[in-house]
């Protein structure tokens, strides 16, 4: 019998080490079992990478993280080349261990008290008019990291009062009341929390999360701030059906969510959950039509769509796919 992994504080556990810590075991995918990517999933890299390297250097200089890098987002080159990034606060080690996600798991260190100021200065230096701030899950903190979110929002607005801020928050498991008390005092311009997938697959895809809890978080923030758009997203291709996706969309509307993102799941490594199917661009268009018919004010649906992909355009209701 193999010895259990003893996690050291501040150490990132990825791939096989991370998956070994998940109760619901996932067998590594053999190369011959991988689904071949269709033509529509091919990414063209920009010819000039100087802007990309500049953003990475600014992140390193200030000890900041982007979810673009930490989660191996397929749109990193495009977004960085356009001077945009989704900032990930509260460190780069997550207390959860979702088998679809490439963010490292482990025992995180204490939050950096100077991060809000460093984040605000970096955003000001980049001249951003719209920024997305997300975080790892911090189940080790009494408020789940809510006060740190609020401090970051305040610091960013102090540097640039006209900036638009979207927060992509964790579920604040067991801490919803405390977190909402904090976040409703310093609300963002868009409140985003992703359901990720359909409830039937939650035990496999989001161990430690609860579908109805996530819906309630979105609903309660909307009740406190009816004027602020709420947003959620799903990855598709993990074994769900289109009918199940549409039912989740209905649940989101019933809980007051007004903005939707749907994108194709991509397997970060062979140790993560495998892709079960590639959803065609035509199917994404059909689901977008369903979403708009349900009353979503905006729905970004396409193979490369992620919740923060061209988030500024999404917030303006412009076409993103």
Curated annotation (Swiss-Prot):
Q: Which Pfam families match?
A: LIAS_N, Radical_SAM
Q: Is Nucleus among this UniProt entry's keywords? A: no
* Claim: Amino-acid biosynthesis is one of the keywords in the record: no
Name of the featured protein? Lipoyl synthase
Q: Which reaction does it catalyse?
A: [[Fe-S] cluster scaffold protein carrying a second [4Fe-4S](2+) cluster] + N(6)-octanoyl-L-lysyl-[protein] + 2 oxidized [2Fe-2S]-[ferredoxin] + 2 S-adenosyl-L-methionine + 4 H(+) = [[Fe-S] cluster scaffold protein] + N(6)-[(R)-dihydrolipoyl]-L-lysyl-[protein] + 4 Fe(3+) + 2 hydrogen sulfide + 2 5'-deoxyadenosine + 2 L-methionine + 2 reduced [2Fe-2S]-[ferredoxin]
Listed under GO cellular component are: cytoplasm
Q: Where does [4Fe-4S] cluster 2 bind?
A: 94, 98, 101
Question: What pathway is it annotated to?
Answer: Protein modification; protein lipoylation via endogenous pathway; protein N(6)-(lipoyl)lysine from octanoyl-[acyl-carrier-protein]: step 2/2
Q: How is the cofactor bound?
A: Binds 2 [4Fe-4S] clusters per subunit. One cluster is coordinated with 3 cysteines and an exchangeable S-adenosyl-L-methionine.
Q: Which cofactor does it need?
A: [4Fe-4S] cluster
The source organism is: Klebsiella pneumoniae subsp. pneumoniae (strain ATCC 700721 / MGH 78578)
Superkingdom of source: Bacteria
